[in-house]
A protein has these predicted regions:
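Nucleotide/pyrophosphate-binding catalytic subdomain
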Residues: 1-218
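Short, intrinsically disordered, charge-balanced linker/junction segments flanking boundaries
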Residues: 223-225
Length: 225
């Protein structure tokens, strides 16, 4: 069994048309029955920001477990919708929330850290399904409460899952083709970087670049993803 982890951000799944395009990308990856896709999705673009804005109006403490429970719903919606589109295209697909695997985390709500992932559950499901769509950015604490990993946490979800199932490949898809010296949508003179080390991309991420979440880079460096 060859497992390809694929992570798609909010702009990639911003609407139904884009979700259909992503579904085609996933389908093209599965050229034989021995290949499986473990897809990690963010919420549709703008959804998480809208939820955060609502919370700010209510003046709710971000350390409240209910904050994480509601904030995680964006990924639940996009993952279920993607699974429906893939199933309609002829692939055997199902969506999974963090607690259904489970992705176990600490109880540091709104910025939890992953402790353990039940890879056995994922591998068992791949006996029945071609594609598993995992809601990124979330897990479950020891006291059975939904947790979130912090903004950009879906990158961390993808790398952690790739490590757990010993994936053959982990791909992070964005609306920018590659890594640039600065945001090419803002800086026209930005240059594409052909090769980059873990240390260099970690420095970029830690300095505010939105290329990858710093924790995902740390995990990738540690486990050679």
């Amino acid at each position: 069994m060859l497992i390809n982890v694929m992570k798609f951000g909010g702009t990639s799944v911003a609407n139904l048309n884009r979700i259909k395009k992503v579904a085609q990308i996933i389908k093209k990856k599965l050229i034989n029955k021995n290949q499986k896709a473990l897809v990690v999705l963010s919420a549709m673009s703008g959804v998480t920001n809208n939820l955060v804005e609502e919370f700010s109006r209510l003046q709710i403490d971000i350390n409240d477990p209910e904050y994480d429970s509601i904030l995680s719903t964006g990924e639940q919606y996009s993952s279920s919708l993607m699974s429906l589109v893939l199933s309609k295209s002829g692939l055997k697909s199902r969506s999974l929330l963090g607690w259904q695997i489970p992705i176990e985390t600490d109880s540091n709500y709104s910025r939890a850290r992953i402790k353990k992932i039940n890879s056995k559950r994922i591998l068992e499901l791949f006996r029945k399904f071609d594609v598993l769509i995992v809601a990124g950015f979330q897990g479950i604490s020891d006291d059975d409460r939904i947790t979130t990993l912090g903004r950009g946490g879906s990158d961390t979800s993808a790398v952690a899952l790739a490590t757990s199932v010993k994936a053959d490949l982990c791909e992070i898809y964005t609306d920018v083709e590659g890594i640039f010296t600065s945001d090419p949508r803002i800086v026209r003179s930005a240059k594409k970087i052909k090769n980059i080390t873990y240390e260099e991309i970690l420095e970029m991420s830690s300095s505010g670049s939105k290329v990858l979440h710093p924790r995902s880079v740390e995990l990738a460096m540690k486990y050679g993803i």
